[in-house]
A protein has these predicted regions:
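Residues in intrinsically disordered, low-complexity segments of regulatory proteins
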Residues: 13, 33, 51-52, 89
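Charge-enriched amphipathic alpha-helical scaffolds
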Residues: 61-85
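Charged low-complexity interaction tracts in eukaryotic proteins
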Residues: 3-20, 77-111
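Short strand-loop junctions, especially beta-strand C-caps/beta-turns
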Residues: 57-60, 95
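Positively charged, polyanion-binding regions of nucleic-acid-associated proteins
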Residues: 23-49, 55-57, 74-76
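Structural motif detector for alpha-helix initiation sites
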Residues: 50-51, 68
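Short, flexible active-site loop motifs that bind/organize anionic cofactors or intermediates
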Residues: 18, 44, 61
Length: 111
């Protein structure tokens, strides 16, 4: 769900209210640059990839651990709104041509 413009998760009975600003500024910068460089926005929903899986792709590439909620916060900051904010693992309107997804499809990450 979104509260006050920020993601908040308690759908599985465990609260995840950590946000991106709880990382040090350099890590925040790396994460936001990675999101902007690795996802191409589209108009239709892409249900193939969840926030939970995508955060692991990012972690594999840059070594920065994020909670699911922190990753969702980064996506919101970069303008990627969830298809359904009431789901635990958000889906986005991102293209299969996005660099992160192309790397996944080629087996270049998350081995």
């Amino acid at each position: 769900m979104i509260k006050n413009g920020k993601p908040f998760s308690n759908e599985n009975g465990w609260e995840d209210k950590k946000l991106l600003d709880q990382l040090d500024p350099e890590e925040q910068k790396i994460v936001l640059e990675w999101v902007r460089a690795n996802f191409i926005p589209i108009k239709r929903a892409n249900y193939k990839h969840s926030s939970y899986y995508l955060k692991h792709v990012m972690q594999y590439e840059n070594g920065i651990y994020l909670t699911n909620n922190q990753f969702k916060d980064a996506m919101l900051i970069c303008g990627f709104n969830p298809v359904d904010p009431n789901e635990l693992n958000w889906r986005y309107r991102i293209s299969e041509k996005s660099p992160a997804i192309q790397k996944m499809n080629r087996g270049e990450c998350c081995a």
